[in-house]
Amino acid sequence: DAEGDKAGRRYAAYDLTKADGQGKWWEGYDPQKLYGGYNMIVPDGISSVKEMNEWHDRHDGAWMERIPEMNPEFARNWYRRCKQLIDDYKPDLIYFDDETDLPMGKYGLMATAHFYNSNMKWHNGRNEAVANAKRLPEDKQRGVVMDCERGALAGISPRPWQTCMCIGNWHYDRGLYGYNGYKTAERVVKTFVDIVSKNGNLLLSIPVRGDGSIDEKEVAFLHDFKAWLDVHGVAIFGSRPWKIFGEGEVKMQNSKSFGDNEKLQASLSEKDIRFTQKDGILYAFVLGFPSQKTVTIRSLGRNSEQMKGRKIRSIRMLGTKKKVE
């Protein structure tokens, strides 16, 4: 604390040791190992937030997940904790929330390998595990599913990938609840369909309150999202990308940083079409209600590159038995 009532005092974790946990919920754990220990310690004598920020900018202002040069034991302990988590809880998916590549160098590879090998033992030799990491180099995309946080790709990827997004913030935000700041089901559906058309998957977060519950607005969102899936899920689950992901006005680039395609995804409209295919059926999603009640899909025109040697046998609209004219 640089300027507050307790200026000069350090946070509790600085002084706590394993012995201090006796009789507490964290008994048996050493805070110095959990929080990194005595590394890059802020010196005494800093008396303003400005001065504190300047110190951090000089010494630890960059987000990094590499092995700390002055504390390699931290990375080894991180691996042991990952291994225990895998062994104790047998997760189906592990998300490494790093800035780029797998975290902690060789220990990130070791943790991922242990996850995959353990999963195969749990499933009679079949690997059903999914590990996520961000902005992976090409060679690692063959073994780890790349995640674009609140982002997207420009086109179809030959390998499965993922977007993670949240209907609000990554933590529960009472302010967003108060002014109805959650994303609508319609907004999320646009992103969802765009992702699936490009061979991607959506990891969607519904923030929980401190007691583990969700509020009634989040429940309403889930009901709306489920209602859409009840009708359109047949064109999503088990589907594959078509020859092209779609057509329209919105043009995206491959995400290079957090959230850099989110506004473009929100702007998808009736003029944007996305395709999926399954069991010999082509599905076309119109990402907005047609104001003129007509839809033109140029990629399905008789003279289009995609339709050479092909004919449309019939057209149906999901959710209704009415004839499409």
Label the model's feature ranges.
Residues 1-325:
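Mature catalytic domains of secreted/periplasmic carbohydrate-active enzymes
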